[in-house]
């Protein structure tokens, strides 16, 4: 996931690099999608699948501009499924790829795609910035974003402590030397470039800036530099293993990824997470937090015993509360991992645009047979998947325990 996130920041979203696609619809028709002008769309035979769907999508976009503007927040993540906002490109052309990208198999089966490839920077380095509190790391992140970093990852004390008590810490301890101050949060600030000398200049300038801020009483108390892919990979391996260790907690309660990928504008992230932590603490839950602070994405997995019926009720309560919280901070419940079984909240985030989203579903799948209950139905009153009504392994585990 870490490498995916870094590529996303460098190159943009999938839809930015899909040149054309071929999809098979439920009727057996094939749909060829690409970016075309209004004139090219109008010139297509009216009986063709491309004309029928292309003209309908164009009308839905052009007739709902105010609703689109209100529904789609200004984020570097997207209100996926269905991306009506980007049916028109910045040049005014029609991009039929945009609706299929992120549709989670609800519109058709993509059988072929032509994509654009971009070169990745060859040089890489990372600065591990250390804090006495996770909130200090979060509040500092916005300022750190002003220095040209490729990515900024944050990790809380729960995840850090798991790493410190694991053998993986031996490989990165040099970057986190002992201090009289207690390490409770880190920002991992990655820089990339195509030129080694240019990268070194950026990183050294950033290091000097951190020294100056620390001397003036800034939030961080230390930092260390990892240069080159081998050293950087050591740090990322620590982060990856620590997150994996979250899933191995002792006892019946295990981290559950149901509010896994909230996303808010980066400038709202620190106060958003502050309230998010208060929400989870009020339910006396254990949890670990990590995320992509430059993108405003937070990953959190509260520990629940899903064999207990009251935990399922709590999962519903927490999700409802987090939905309200993300709306308050102009964000999304799903910043990276799609809607899936959380689709019941799609009408909340699409708002007045939701009927148009349902029209897209009806255009492609009027019988609601492709991944039914996810993202949208062919009519606004079509039932959607609910998080506390999907089959869970815990249901089977409960029968084993009871038996």
How does the language model describe each region?
Residues 16-19, 23, 95, 107, ...:
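Active-site capping/gating regions of soluble enzymes
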Residues 3-9, 173-177, 308-312, 352-359:
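Short, structured secondary-structure boundary patches
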Residues 52, 56, 67, 198, ...:
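Exposed alpha-helical structural elements
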Residues 1-141, 366-377, 381-403:
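FAD-binding subdomain of flavoenzyme oxidoreductases
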Residues 90-91, 97-317, 323-325, 329-332, ...:
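C-terminal substrate-recognition/cap domain of FAD-linked oxidoreductases
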Residues 7, 13, 24-45, 154-162, ...:
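Non-transmembrane, interaction-prone segments in cytosolic or luminal domains
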Residues 5, 12, 79-81, 193-196, ...:
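Glycine-centered flexibility motif
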């Amino acid at each position: 996931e870490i490498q995916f996130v870094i590529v996303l920041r460098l190159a943009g979203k999938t839809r930015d690099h899909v040149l054309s696609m071929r999809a098979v619809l439920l009727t057996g028709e094939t749909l060829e999608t690409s970016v075309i002008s209004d004139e090219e769309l109008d010139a297509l035979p009216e009986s063709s699948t491309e004309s029928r769907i292309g003209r309908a999508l164009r009308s839905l976009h052009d007739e709902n501009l105010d609703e689109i503007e209100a529904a789609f927040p200004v984020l570097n993540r997207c209100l996926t499924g269905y991306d009506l906002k980007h049916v028109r490109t910045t040049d005014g052309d029609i991009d039929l790829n945009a609706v299929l990208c992120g549709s989670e198999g609800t519109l058709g089966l993509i059988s072929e795609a032509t994509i654009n490839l971009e070169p990745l920077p060859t040089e890489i380095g990372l600065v591990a910035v250390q804090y006495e509190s996770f909130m200090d790391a979060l509040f500092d992140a916005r300022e750190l974003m002003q220095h040209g970093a490729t990515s900024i990852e944050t990790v809380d004390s729960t995840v850090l402590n798991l790493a410190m008590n694991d053998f993986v810490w031996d490989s990165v301890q040099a970057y986190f030397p002992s201090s009289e101050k207690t390490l409770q949060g880190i920002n991992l600030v990655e820089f990339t470039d195509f030129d080694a000398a240019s990268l070194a200049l950026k990183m050294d300038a950033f290091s000097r800036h951190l020294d100056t801020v620390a001397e003036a009483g800034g939030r961080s108390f230390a930092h260390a530099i990892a240069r080159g892919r081998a050293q950087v990979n050591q740090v990322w391996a620590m982060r990856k293993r620590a997150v994996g260790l979250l899933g191995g907690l002792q006892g019946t309660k295990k981290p559950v990824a149901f509010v896994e990928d909230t996303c808010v504008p980066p400038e709202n992230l620190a106060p958003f997470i502050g309230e998010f932590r208060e929400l989870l603490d009020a339910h006396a839950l254990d949890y670990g937090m990590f995320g992509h602070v430059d993108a405003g994405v937070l990953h959190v997995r509260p520990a629940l015993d899903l064999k207990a019926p009251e935990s399922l009720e709590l999962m519903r309560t927490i999700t409802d509360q987090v939905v309200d919280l993300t709306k308050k901070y102009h964000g999304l419940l799903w910043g990276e991992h799609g809607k899936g079984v959380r689709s019941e909240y799609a009408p909340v985030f699409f708002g007045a645009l939701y009927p148009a989203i349902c029209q897209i579903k009806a255009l492609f799948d009027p019988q609601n047979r492709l991944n039914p209950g996810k993202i949208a139905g062919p009519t606004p009153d079509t039932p959607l998947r609910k998080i506390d009504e999907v089959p869970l392994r815990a249901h089977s585990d409960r029968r084993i325990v009871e038996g």
